[in-house]
Amino acid sequence: MPLIVKPTPAHPEPPAHKIMPAFATRFGPKLAGEVAATDRLVRVNALTALCDALSDPEQAHGCADAGVVETLNAHVSGGQDAPTRVLAAKALCGCARDARAARAMVDAATPAAIQGACLNDAEQDVRMHCYDALIRLGGGPRRGASSIVAAGYPKALVEKAEKESVGLQPRALDLLTSCLGNEQGLAEALDAGGIATCLSLLGSMEAAVRAAAGRCLAGLCFDVSAKDAAVEADAVDILCALLEDPDLGARRAACAALVSVTTTDEGKRRMVPAEPRPRDAVAAIIALLAEPDAYLTTTACKLVANVAVHPKVRAQLREDKECLPAIDALIAGPGTDQDALVAQHARIAKDAVLWEP
């Protein structure tokens, strides 16, 4: 019986819009080319694949080396369709998590390239991903924050923060905060009215906005003249009210900002207002000493050490039945490294409260 050999059917070509991964060194160049495709379906599918690939450091390096960041910049700033812009912005956020890809973002001037989209794109998701990408970039090596400042973000963010949608206001403020470690960024934010913007947003109905505004205000008050400006704008009263905020993040931020502004003599004097406050600020500070949050108790100890310089405040702290026992409890913590740091600041606070002229 003759042997019958059946021909093996050829494998069908995959659809043009289906993204098939390459291997080794071809992975990055192939995907980068597909991300730049003119066909919308191919481009969107490639961007989706890129967002997944960026979680792998090796694949992220390959894509960055293939020049994908420049393509993403172009899509975010000039993409005609919303899915392309959203996915490209999301991919930039993934790039910012990787050291080599983040370096490529700085080299490609990403902050300047996407500024218009970051602040003004009609799609909220585009703005959200752009904020997240730049916050990560600004939180890394100094080159990242410097590139954001050089692109003019401090002034633009001060102007944008109050106008931004409430859901994105915390991101706008956090991005502004990331610029404040740069001397030029701090100066530009102050010149643009950053103090007034932060004080205004401390009154927001959203806890996340209040917390972000407090963090930003604390960063702005690194500058001595900014402390004076904040004090003159009634920052002490506003921040004292927030010490009893139901949100932990807002209490943390308010306490940190108060530590900054009460380093000045006028800030200390404002702790004793001419007219009594609706709620006693010193009592609120003492209550923070008993919080279970180590960051908050450490900051509260710093605040006690600052304000205890004022004789009236020092007397009130000393006479309060809960103040010194709360400080002693922090000094005698369980003994972890974190507790040791809290105890160190608690000892300083206790010395300030018990100081006699």
What are these regions (language model features)?
Residues 23-28, 64-72, 106-115, 148-156, ...:
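Alpha-helical scaffold repeats of the Armadillo/HEAT/TPR superfamily
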Residues 61, 103, 143-146, 184-187, ...:
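Recurring C-terminal helix/loop segment of individual leucine-rich repeat
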